Amino acid sequence: MDKFLIKMPIKPKNNETPEQKPMVKKETPKAAAKQSNKNTPIQAKEKENAQENDTPKQGRAGRSAKPAAKRKNLDTFEVNKEKNTAESENPPKRRSGRLTRSTRSMAEEGTPSPEKVKPEKLPFIKYRGAIKYFTENQDIAASADDVMQWVDKQTDVDVVPMAFDMEWPFSFQTGPGKSSVIQICVDEKCCYVYQLTNLKKLPAALVALINHPKVRLHGVNIKADFRKLQRDFPEVSADALIEKCVDLGVWCNEICETGGRWSLERLANFIAKKAMDKSKKVRMSKWHVIPLDENQLMYAAIDVYIGQVIYRDLEQREKQKLINELQFKEQNGEAAFKAVKGLGETFLSKINEVTL
């Protein structure tokens, strides 16, 4: 009930007077501030100067900046040296390049392909052989017949390798044009360039040459060339040519036990230790225009010439590899051969003995 009681003031008696406490006026902060601000003009000026020296300067956004004496000079030699040391010890992470379906390796698992390594400076290929260039149907047929007769005379071998390549114009507006040039090489001393612009149909002698049972056509990504040739000239059967052709990139992966997809230029770097002048101006030139100029003819000839050189080199490596593997098995046994093979040995060079 106490909370409902109201305390009433007690009235003093008639004879008693209430004691009055002295009134003390409390100073509020504002009043104190006003009182402290009352200075003479000289004192106010001195106070302003002192505040300018003690308070930091204001930045653009009103933020107080650090005193100039305490600011660290980021351009000094010591700071740059510390930054370089820190970056070398902990290099910044880079976003890895994302592989797309077109750039992803289509080869089987194996040692990473040396084509991904930046090639060293190599001497450019110099072709000094003959270039036989034909544009008319009857001339192309006669030349193909001569090559076929030369193939028939190679009685000491079962297979005659022939480098094969094609060229055609390309436009970013209309895409690839019709197959315009076929170049072949059966001997490193002579290359044949056949321009197909005036041909509605391939000569029968040329079709017979590329389908000769003794001829082994080879190149880089050669299967795609055969499919395009069949689209442009239906008298050619791409499937029959694909069955007996050799893709130099795939063959290199089998022999050297590398991986990945190869270009002719990178394959020339790795196998032949030569550089190719793949000028975009020549590569994207008008291959359908007659006649071809000297740069175009040399470009076409070098493509099949270096292809023939690479084939011969891989052929020798394959033979030597088989010999080394056979000798190792005879000396160390099948179990040791499998163990060493599992460690990544390619047997491209001879191994005399092994300790397991």
UniProtKB/Swiss-Prot annotation:
Composition bias type Basic and acidic residues, residue spans: 13-29, 44-57, 72-92
EC number: 3.1.11.-
Residues that bind Mg(2+) 2: D165
Locations listed in the record: Nucleus
Spans annotated as Disordered: 1-117
Record-listed Mg(2+) 1 binding positions: D165, E167, D303
Pfam families, per the entry: DNA_pol_A_exo1
Top-level taxon of the source organism: Eukaryota
3'-5' exonuclease domain span: 155-316
InterPro entries: 3'-5'_exonuclease_dom, 3-5_Exonuclease_domain, RNaseH-like_sf, RNaseH_sf
GO terms under cellular component: nucleus
GO MF annotation terms: 3'-5' exonuclease activity; metal ion binding; nucleic acid binding
Keyword line: Exonuclease, Hydrolase, Magnesium, Metal-binding, Nuclease, Nucleus, Phosphoprotein
Modified residues (Phosphoserine): S105, S113
Enzyme type, top EC level: hydrolase
Family under the similarity heading: Belongs to the WRNexo family.
Function: Has exonuclease activity on both single-stranded and duplex templates bearing overhangs, but not blunt ended duplex DNA, and cleaves in a 3'-5' direction. Essential for the formation of DNA replication focal centers. Has an important role in maintaining genome stability.
UniProt protein name: 3'-5' exonuclease
